[in-house]
A protein has these predicted regions:
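N-terminal strand-loop element at the rim of the active site
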Residues: 5-69, 158-160, 229
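A conserved mid-protein helix/loop that constitutes part of the nucleotide-sugar donor-binding site
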Residues: 13-24, 185, 192-211, 218, ...
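Glycosyltransferase donor-sugar binding loop
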Residues: 36-43, 190, 217-231
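Short His-centered aromatic/hydrophobic patch
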Residues: 89-95, 111
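A short, active-site helix/loop in glycosyltransferases that binds the activated sugar's phosphate group
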Residues: 134-159, 165-169
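Aromatic "clamp/platform" in nucleotide-sugar-dependent glycosyltransferases that forms part
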Residues: 251, 270
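Short hydrophobic beta-strand element within catalytic cores of glycosyltransferases
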Residues: 287-290, 297
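Conserved acidic donor-binding segment of nucleotide-sugar-dependent glycosyltransferases
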Residues: 302-314, 322-326
Length: 358
């Protein structure tokens, strides 16, 4: 089977990382797999591209930024070149472009968004026109289904497939050659700099954590999606006198090492789809403090996981302090591994290809 994954931009973010992991898994399983994008590769994706190419996954990324017609032209060329049997379009904008072209292969729209894309009138109108051009719609969480049905209506083939994590990459066994962990109490948050990820609240809470645990430090890493928000985080760190204890950094590809070395993972998101970052933290065993939102509820009873109202600074502070004294834990992630997710995607691929030929 020839499988093409389409993303908006090759970057270190959830949808793109899942597409990369699926592509490599499927290629290793004997399929012929490519990954295409609508805009050029971000610098932070370089190491992931090396990994893709080392596993013989074809990368079809434009070398310059195009307007809407240019994006359609580029995508048409890439589809003709790759000749896919099925296209998985990851996120709403790539799914728009894939369905706007007369692509013979069935298109599967994968809803990754943490927010409701269809609150925007334009997106709602376009999706209503293109909805049936998708042979299937995959939602990564039940909230995505609710958003779609509420704004667009029912789709003939719609299902929830949770994201999955590569367990082998995040367990302690992956770091046996690293030696012992560093000993400084460390809290880490990894995610795009945007209001929905709520890094500002983590900085406020950490200001109080540092009063209880003077040796503690905070590491923030992620794609700078909102430069004004990133600047606000940096300014708050400086204003609170935390510059020597807080790192406000860009995206990192060595997430498993960061989780191995840190003591607590913070995730005060206001909304999520089905977060890859949250799954990676759970797989690593690190104590987790996260917001009590619906997509995280499945982990509420897991060891060393606290789901709280992270907008309550005092409660958030107390949870972080408590987590710094907790032990790492093994969590039951059956059904949430990369293999589980890849198997479900392959089942969808077989189903839509069969339907297209009958």
């Amino acid at each position: 089977m020839r499988i093409l994954h389409l993303v908006l931009a090759p970057r270190l973010s959830g949808a793109e990382v899942l597409a990369k992991d699926l592509a490599i898994h499927q290629q290793r399983s004997g399929e012929t797999v490519g990954i295409a994008s609508l805009v050029p590769q971000h610098d932070d994706f370089a190491s992931l591209r090396v990994e893709l190419e080392a596993n013989s996954v074809t990368c079809l990324f434009p070398t310059k930024l195009h307007g809407p017609l240019g994006k359609l032209w580029h995508l048409d060329r890439m589809v003709r070149r790759f000749r896919p049997d099925v296209v998985f379009a990851h996120a709403t904008i790539p799914a728009f472009y894939a369905r706007a072209l007369p692509i013979a292969a069935p298109v599967v729209y994968v809803m990754h968004s943490a927010a409701n894309d269809f609150e925007r009138g334009l997106f709602r109108r376009v999706e209503r026109m293109l909805s049936r051009r998708a042979r299937a719609v995959i939602a990564v969480s039940p909230a995505n289904v609710d958003d779609y049905v509420g704004a667009i209506g029912n789709h003939p083939l719609m299902m929830v497939i949770p994201n999955g994590v590569d367990m082998a990459r995040f367990g302690d066994a992956a770091h046996v050659e690293r030696g012992p962990r560093q000993t400084q109490p460390t809290i880490v948050q990894i995610g795009r700099y945007t209001t929905v990820k709520n890094q500002l609240q983590t900085v406020h809470a950490f200001h109080d954590v540092a009063k209880w645990i003077p040796a503690a430090r905070l590491l923030l890493y992620g794609v700078v999606e909102d430069s004004a928000y990133y600047q606000a985080v940096t300014e708050l760190v400086n204003r609170l006198g935390l510059a020597d204890r807080v790192v406000v950094g860009g995206p990192r590809s060595d997430v498993s090492s960061l989780l191995f070395d840190a003591n607590v993972y913070a995730m005060p998101s206001r909304s999520e789809g089905h977060s890859i970052a949250f799954l990676e933290a759970l797989a690593s065993g690190i104590p987790v403090v996260a917001s009590a939102i619906r997509p995280f509820a499945f982990a509420a009873d897991f060891a060393s996981v606290q789901l709280i109202d992270t907008d309550d600074t005092q409660a958030y502070t107390q949870a972080l302090v408590a987590a710094l004294s907790q032990s790492r834990a093994q969590r039951p992630l059956a059904g949430l591994t990369l293999k589980d997710t890849a198997d479900r995607y392959m089942a969808v691929a077989h189903r839509v290809i069969q339907a297209a030929t009958t």
